[in-house]
Amino acid sequence: MHPLLNPLLLALGLMALLLTTVIALTCLGGFASPGPVPPSTALRELIEELVNITQNQKAPLCNGSMVWSINLTAGMYCAALESLINVSGCSAIEKTQRMLSGFCPHKVSAGQFSSLHVRDTKIEVAQFVKDLLLHLKKLFREGQFN
């Protein structure tokens, strides 16, 4: 065999082994990737976010903006999002809006209204958030995560 052939074959063999290893690790990496967040964790995170909002109020939340009150018994995540999505220019509730959209099975857009709104009653965003927080804490204690 030619003396230069051995190092060349060795280098090609190592490159093939390295490429095989990279491909195998890439394929197996999908098995270790995180799955969907359990509903209990998502609800706990939403509760924590609402606690942060209510505790860190130095000025009126969202400049005292008003939202439609909602029925907190059924389909409340989408109804809450529908109310809050109509508040513009309030960075304090943006994370809450994103979190609520994770609980709502359909896309919600501004101006959309559900039958779950109590259409004759508007309340301040701060009171809305407090009411929602109390209700979510109750659901969490009762183990109702969906």
Curated annotation (Swiss-Prot):
Glycans are attached at residues 52, 63, 71, 86. Residues 1-24 form the signal peptide. Disulfide bonds join 62-90, 78-104. Keywords: Cytokine, Disulfide bond, Glycoprotein, Secreted, Signal. GO terms for molecular function: cytokine activity; interleukin-13 receptor binding. Its main location: secreted. GO terms for cellular component: cytoplasm; external side of plasma membrane; extracellular region; extracellular space. One of its GO terms (biological process) is response to ethanol. Gene3D superfamilies: 1.20.1250.10. It comes from the Eukaryota. It is found in: Secreted. InterPro entries: 4_helix_cytokine-like_core (IPR009079), IL-13 (IPR020470), IL-4/IL-13 (IPR001325), IL-4/IL-13_CS (IPR018096). Cytokine that plays important roles in allergic inflammation and immune response to parasite infection. Synergizes with IL2 in regulating interferon-gamma synthesis. Stimulates B-cell proliferation, and activation of eosinophils, basophils, and mast cells. Plays an important role in controlling IL33 activity by modulating the production of transmembrane and soluble forms of interleukin-1 receptor-like 1/IL1RL1. It is linked to Allergic rhinitis: A common disease with complex inheritance characterized by mucosal inflammation caused by allergen exposure. Belongs to the IL-4/IL-13 family. Interacts with IL13RA2. This is Interleukin-13. It comes from Homo sapiens (Human).
